[in-house]
């Protein structure tokens, strides 16, 4: 997805939409012995944000990583649907990115029946792309006046970009996704350390999240909560 956008295959980007619905916090799990629920909904342990801190930061990072553009301001409304919960469990965010790109971001942990359905869509002047976490091997390319194309992961799919091929591990038809993504991050970081120790230049194809992405995630949380409280756009 990132390569398709950076190479201009769908034209100048106009809009991006990312949604991240989960349903596991639809009830007051934190009142029981569910440790995963208890710390995530306790502001003394997780900070000022609930769902936006837990999964909203991943959605925001996805927007910036795929488009290659930074969020410059946002307007949000967060909600607490489960009575007695101390932190928000749902929210919607309008995004303005660099280069006049507009976006929508939705996260929810009270979307009953959902598991972990992260999905991102990007539209440009000449087409769009769609990818979802539950089917990580597939990416839909939607070009203007053309049938939709289904692009599949796999080291033997030569139509993929060099970047995509460098992060595939198995031949096409074999499932790979969540666990392999972590492995790629660890491998890419190890390459960077090795290159540094041997005075070699890093290959930008092997990228990984840095402290800057972590910092931007914290800024996102602050801006979302402030925007929702003050009912205004926050840069």
Model-found features: residue ranges?
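A general structural signal for well-ordered alpha-helical segments in protein cores
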Residues: 59-60, 185-190, 221
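C-terminal glycine/acidic-rich active-site capping loop/insertion
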Residues: 65, 73, 92-97, 126-208
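Internal hydrophobic scaffold segments of catalytic domains
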Residues: 1-21, 116-149
């Amino acid at each position: 997805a990132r390569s398709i956008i950076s190479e201009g295959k769908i034209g100048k980007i106009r809009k991006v939409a990312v949604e991240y619905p989960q349903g596991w916090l639809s009830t007051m799990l934190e009142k029981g012995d569910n440790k995963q629920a208890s710390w995530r909904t306790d502001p003394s342990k997780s900070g000022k944000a609930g769902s936006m801190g837990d999964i909203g930061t991943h959605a925001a990072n996805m927007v910036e990583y795929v488009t290659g553009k930074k969020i410059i301001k946002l307007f949000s409304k967060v909600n607490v649907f489960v009575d007695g919960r101390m932190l928000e469990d749902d929210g919607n965010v309008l995004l303005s990115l660099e280069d006049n790109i507009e976006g929508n971001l939705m996260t929810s942990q009270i979307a009953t029946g959902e598991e972990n359905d992260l999905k991102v869509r990007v539209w440009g002047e000449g087409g769009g792309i769609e990818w979802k976490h539950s089917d990580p091997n597939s990416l839909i390319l939607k070009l203007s006046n053309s049938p939709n194309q289904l692009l599949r992961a796999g080291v033997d799919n030569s139509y993929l970009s060099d970047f995509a091929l460098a992060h595939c591990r198995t031949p096409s038809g074999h499932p790979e996704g969540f666990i392999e993504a972590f492995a790629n991050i660890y491998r890419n970081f190890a390459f960077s350390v090795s290159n540094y120790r041997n005075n070699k230049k890093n290959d930008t194809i092997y990228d990984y999240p840095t402290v800057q992405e972590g910092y931007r995630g914290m800024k996102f949380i602050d801006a979302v909560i402030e925007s929702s409280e003050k009912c205004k756009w926050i840069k």
